């Protein structure tokens, strides 16, 4: 995200626990090397704990708290003195509700600084004189649906630039909050990650047709930033095919296997980084952290068992999980497997390419990447799955 919209006086407000402080800390670190943090309601030690959890550089922060001090004019004067003495690049004021809600005080705070400022408040800060003066106004909120938490940052006003969207989803994770932008299926990286074609073999005519249609493909595979969905059956052959695809990608690039249930484990016959992330964990930001840990520096994320996410948490949650990965790692290619369900149009816009594979047949249901051959027979010979173009 372009942080130039935060180059003036920004006010972030919302209910407690929605992630205001975490977002302010992350943005502040991106705006300057030296950060002055003024806290009106939390002790310095608690702010330090948050900085450590977010894995930010604590040496860049000078933290002052003014807990239980009732002389507000004296506090304002002290903040001004600290600002002059510290000479920071950016200031964070956490707890602007502490100050009198009048134009005179708001003007004093607004005019005190000539560098980027991020002020944090709770309601009714969004209707205060300071909100009127602010260059950037963000309302943060959260809601729960089917047991899953959703955080939002809504840009209500921006004088110094165009925000990326009117509203962004947000996840508070180690390493700093991730602003989750909608995935753009046309925004792909230049590098292709091919199947090794040792376990999954496409017939020569299919490979040649694909190479002619897409010069960036020497053979079937994934582009950086792309997403492919495979809808397969639930039988042993289906699990073996999914494992074959996984292992072929693992031979071409670092690949991480993340699964919501252990069904596929016994079918994986190659050395690949793997991790179980239960569906219930994906209802909150801790589960998204687990995804980050599981993916690490892999080039391909192989997600198995996503039908369970749809059944238990809903399509909305699946979209957030996928968009989180794309926002955190725009270069990450995703191969997503759904077992025992039919491809649904509700899911199509989450993927560049959608396959249906079952009972010896494979069909490209959707392709934004130019698959010229859409139907295949699938035959298993000598330990490999062969995809042979078919008119049936």
Where are these regions (language model features)?
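Glycine-rich P-loop/Walker A and Walker A-like loops and their local beta1-loop-alpha1 context
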Residues: 4-33, 202-262
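Residue-level preference for the first positions of well-ordered beta-strands
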Residues: 9-11, 34-36, 89-92, 116-118, ...
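Conserved inter-motif catalytic segment of the P-loop NTP-binding fold
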Residues: 33-101, 256-315
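Short, hydrophobic beta-strand segments that form beta-sheet elements in well-ordered domains
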Residues: 36-39, 117-122, 255-261, 278-279, ...
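P-loop NTPase motor core
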Residues: 79-137, 293-353
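Phosphate-binding/switch region of NTP-binding enzymes
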Residues: 121-174, 337-392
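Charged, amphipathic alpha-helical linker segments immediately N-terminal to NTP-binding catalytic cores
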Residues: 159-205
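Long, charge-rich C-terminal accessory regions
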Residues: 223-225, 231, 235-248, 252-254, ...
């Amino acid at each position: 995200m372009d942080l130039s919209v935060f180059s003036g006086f920004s006010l972030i407000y919302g209910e407690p626990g929605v992630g205001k402080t975490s977002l302010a800390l992350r943005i502040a670190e991106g705006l300057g090397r030296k950060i002055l943090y003024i806290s009106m309601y939390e002790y310095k030690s608690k702010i330090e704990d948050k900085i450590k959890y977010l894995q930010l550089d604590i040496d860049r922060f000078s933290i002052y708290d003014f807990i239980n001090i009732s002389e507000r004019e004296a506090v304002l004067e002290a903040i001004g003195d600290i600002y002059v003495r510290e000479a920071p690049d950016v200031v964070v004021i956490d707890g602007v509700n502490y100050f009198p809600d009048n134009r005179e005080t708001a003007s004093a705070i607004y005019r005190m600084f000539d560098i980027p400022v991020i002020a944090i408040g709770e309601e009714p800060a969004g209707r205060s004189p300071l909100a009127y003066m602010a260059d950037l106004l963000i309302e943060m909120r959260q809601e729960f649906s089917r047991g899953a938490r959703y955080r939002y940052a809504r840009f209500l006003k921006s004088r110094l630039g165009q925000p990326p969207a009117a509203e962004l989803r947000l996840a508070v994770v180690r390493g700093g909050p991730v602003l989750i932008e909608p995935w753009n299926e046309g925004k792909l990286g230049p590098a292709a990650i091919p199947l090794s074609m040792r376990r999954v073999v496409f017939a020569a005519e299919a490979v040649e047709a694909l190479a002619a249609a897409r010069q960036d493909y020497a053979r079937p595979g994934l582009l950086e930033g792309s997403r492919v969905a495979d809808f397969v059956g639930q039988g042993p052959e289906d699990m073996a095919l999914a494992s074959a695809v996984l292992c072929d990608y693992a031979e071409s690039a670092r690949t991480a296997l993340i699964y919501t249930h252990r069904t596929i484990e016994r079918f994986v016959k190659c050395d690949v980084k793997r991790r179980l992330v239960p569906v219930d964990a994906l209802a909150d930001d801790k589960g998204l952290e687990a995804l980050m840990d599981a993916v690490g520096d892999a080039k391909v994320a192989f997600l198995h068992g996503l039908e369970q996410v749809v059944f238990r948490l809903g399509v909305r949650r699946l979209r957030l999980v996928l968009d989180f990965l794309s926002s955190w790692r725009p270069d990450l290619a995703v191969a997503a497997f759904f077992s025992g369900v039919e491809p649904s149009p509700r899911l199509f816009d989450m993927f560049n390419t959608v396959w249906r594979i079952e009972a010896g047949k494979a069909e490209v249901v959707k392709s934004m990447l130019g698959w010229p051959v859409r139907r295949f027979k699938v035959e298993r010979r000598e330990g490999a799955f062969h995809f042979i173009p078919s008119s049936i």
